[in-house]
Regions:
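Short S/T/G/P-rich N-terminal loop/turn motif that feeds into the first structured element of a domain
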Residues: 1-50, 59-67, 83-125
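Short arginine-rich
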Residues: 76-78, 84
Length: 125
């Protein structure tokens, strides 16, 4: 699984433009083979900073998205004035687990917090 972390600082008065561009891309994104999910957030520390976090099955799926013409067009719009700055990080997900699905948790973590332990039962109530 691949994670894409896109931090963006819209130019003054351009925050809504970014959100509109993201909304235009969403239907195309959801049709992409290998797309898993995307969410957007605003920083609590820097109110000008937005973050888009997306997950992809593999690098090939991400490469296909990167080369969709509409996506390239929106990227160019962003670079021409919607963004004051941005930073993109692409990372391989090493493990993917949660409170109840512990299959990929490290063995020491599974031993310390087994599914069905008293602390988890209380949390579910």
């Amino acid at each position: 699984m691949i994670a894409v972390i896109f931090e963006a600082w819209p130019a003054p008065g351009k925050g809504e433009d970014y959100m509109e561009m993201a909304a235009q891309l969403r239907p195309h994104l959801e049709k992409m083979d290998g797309f898993i999910s995307v969410e957007r957030f605003r920083s609590l520390i820097d109110s000008d900073k937005l973050l888009s976090l997306s997950f992809w099955r593999d690098e090939a799926a991400l490469e296909a998205w990167r080369n969709v013409e509409m996506h390239r067009s929106v990227q160019a719009q962003g670079r021409r004035g919607v963004f004051r700055d941005y930073r993109l990080r692409v990372a391989a997900v090493l493990r993917d687990y949660g409170m109840f699905n512990r299959d990929e948790a490290p063995s020491d973590s599974r031993a310390a917090h087994p599914v069905g332990s008293d602390d988890l039962l209380g949390a579910r109530l």
